[in-house]
From Swiss-Prot:
Family the UniProt entry places it in: Belongs to the ATPase alpha/beta chains family.
Gene3D superfamilies, per database record: 2.40.10.170, Bovine Mitochondrial F1-atpase, Atp Synthase Beta Chain, Chain D, domain 3, P-loop containing nucleotide triphosphate hydrolases
The keyword Transmembrane helix is annotated on this UniProt entry: no
Family annotation (InterPro entries): AAA+_ATPase, ATP-synt_VA_C, ATP_synth_F1_bsu, ATPase_a/bsu_AS, ATPase_alpha/beta_chains, ATPase_F1/V1/A1_a/bsu_N, ATPase_F1/V1/A1_a/bsu_N_sf, ATPase_F1/V1/A1_a/bsu_nucl-bd
This protein's name: ATP synthase subunit beta
UniProt keyword list: ATP synthesis, ATP-binding, Cell membrane, CF(1), Hydrogen ion transport, Ion transport, Membrane, Nucleotide-binding, Translocase, Transport
Organismal lineage: Bacteria, Bacillati, Bacillota, Bacilli, Bacillales
UniProt organism field: Bacillus cytotoxicus (strain DSM 22905 / CIP 110041 / 391-98 / NVH 391-98)
Chain's role: Produces ATP from ADP in the presence of a proton gradient across the membrane. The catalytic sites are hosted primarily by the beta subunits.
EC id: 7.1.2.2
Places the protein is found: Cell membrane
Classification via Pfam families: ATP-synt_ab (PF00006), ATP-synt_ab_N (PF02874), ATP-synt_VA_C (PF22919)
């Protein structure tokens, strides 16, 4: 066993000197077990002079210089396979729920590995129905694709991800992995209990490295979840759903330790290796000939600035983006998805079909024209518009409200039952609005409803 001693402690970063010149490899896990301290470190740099610089996976409180350190000889390894389902883990793959330890004979895989080779990748394109109108119509998700939910603080990223878990995980019936990266422990706890109540937990593995954890854990916990998902894809040929909330915290944790590791900061103080780290993670989240990983990632946008290097780097890796907009939350439109800024490479006639494509484009054109007219309305009022433009505004407002709907996961707050709307229903509803079939119905009848039939019902109640 290769042993060394702690020579320097700088918060979450620890320097270890090994005698005899036998240094552990980069990414190897080192272990410290002494009195109260039980700590795992990951090798980040070789400094020369027989010394390595490491990042701690839990708090370094109580650690002193001179403490003995063991090299485990391999990267952090976490349990994989069916034993992980229904359980909750930390970054090291240790069970943190109340159901006891994971048996020692369960297979463990290292969290660092190469992305699949180019010839192994799958090129199939198939739409994943979410039951959320604005997503299915304007920025449809691809099965086996990468999806980003972008938004600032408090615009509903976590609620949207929970609704997607509720809709897709239950409809899909396959295996899901949830990685909670640097978010609120309360939300993780709520999600665990919701999933337990609905029974989805039996087919889900959950991994958490929350806000209160040191940056080492927050930086690596996404890889822990990904390793579990990769096993189901590669060894069992499953179609896996991987939820990551929040991928920005992965970058943020990297920037916290970057300066302590002695690297020069780059733009906005981020680590110079930002694009590389993001690429190493994202390239592993992919679909192969054996199975698929569909990943849905929440992306926090600092100060609502989409040009910030963290969200800007994430954009490049995604197949579909769902952009959440604070302006819409202020109007009471939930989910607050911006229909003009959200994108998907699946929105083409070859993939979604001619009718769906035409309806989606007409919806976007109507909303874009309404946006352009808003300045005129603000200055001169509605009366100065031409009859044609008045009709555009009239329909655009109905479309805007019809893009909202109630969520199952928000039922306890709103008191309204959630709705799941199939894609065909969604396309039919918007087509009827564009054709003017519902021009005579009051605007408020379109707000927070499911299908177009619900709108007609609401209108009858309002007019009664």
């Amino acid at each position: 066993m290769n042993k060394g001693r702690v020579t320097q402690i700088m918060g979450p970063v620890v320097d270890v000197k090994f005698d005899g010149g036998k240094l552990p490899e980069i990414y190897n896990a080192l272990r410290i077990k002494k009195d109260e301290v039980n700590l795992t470190l990951e090798v980040a740099l070789h400094l020369g002079d027989d010394t390595v610089r490491t990042v701690a996976m839990s708090s370094t409180d109580g650690l002193v210089r001179g403490t003995e350190v063991e090299d485990t000889g391999r990267p952090i390894s976490v349990p994989v396979g069916d034993a992980t389902l229904g359980r909750v883990f930390n970054v090291l793959g240790e069970a943190i729920d109340l159901d006891g330890e994971i048996p020692a004979d369960v297979r463990r895989d290292p969290i660092h590995r190469q992305a699949p080779a180019f010839e192994e990748l799958s090129t199939k394109v198939e739409i994943l129905e979410t039951g959320i109108k604005v997503v299915d119509l304007l920025a449809p998700y691809i099965k086996g694709g990468k999806i980003g939910l972008f938004g600032g603080a408090g615009v509903g990223k976590t609620v949207l991800i929970q609704e997607l878990i509720n809709n897709i995980a239950q409809e899909h019936g396959g295996i899901s992995v949830f990685a909670g990266v640097g978010e609120r422990t309360r939300e993780g706890n709520d999600l665990y209990h919701e999933m337990s109540d609905s029974g989805v937990i039996k087919k889900t593995a959950m991994v958490f490295g929350q806000m209160n954890e040191p940056p080492g854990a927050r930086q690596r916990v996404a890889l822990t979840g990904l390793t579990m998902a990769e096993h189901f894809r590669d060894e069992q040929g499953q179609d896996v759903l991987l939820f990551i909330d929040n991928i920005f915290r992965f970058t943020q944790a990297g920037s916290e330790v970057s300066a302590l590791l002695g690297r020069m900061p780059s733009a906005v103080g981020y680590q110079p290796t930002l694009a590389t780290e993001m690429g190493q993670l994202q390239e592993r989240i992919t679909s192969t000939n054996k199975g698929s990983i569909t990943s849905i990632q929440a992306v926090y946008v600092p100060a609502d600035d989409y040009t910030d290097p963290a969200p800007a780097t994430t954009f490049a890796h995604l197949d579909a983006t769902t952009n959440l907009e604070r302006r819409l939350t202020q109007m009471g439109i939930y989910p607050a998805v911006d229909p003009l800024a959200s994108t998907s490479r699946a929105l083409s006639p070859e993939i979604v079909g001619e009718e769906h494509y035409e309806v989606a484009r007409q919806v976007q054109q109507t909303l874009q024209r309404y946006k352009e007219l808003q300045d005129i309305i603000a200055i001169l009022g509605m009366d100065e518009l031409s009859e044609e433009d008045k009709l555009v505004v009239h329909r655009a407002r109905r479309i805007q409200f019809f893009l909202s709907q109630n969520f199952h996961v928000a039922e306890q707050f709103t008191g309204q039952p959630g709705s799941y709307v199939p894609v065909k229903e969604t396309v039919r509803g918007f087509k009827e609005i564009l054709e003017g079939k519902h021009d005579d119905l009051p605007e408020d009848a379109f707000r927070l409803v499911g299908g177009i039939e619900e709108v007609v019902e609401n209108a009858k109640k309002m007019m009664a």
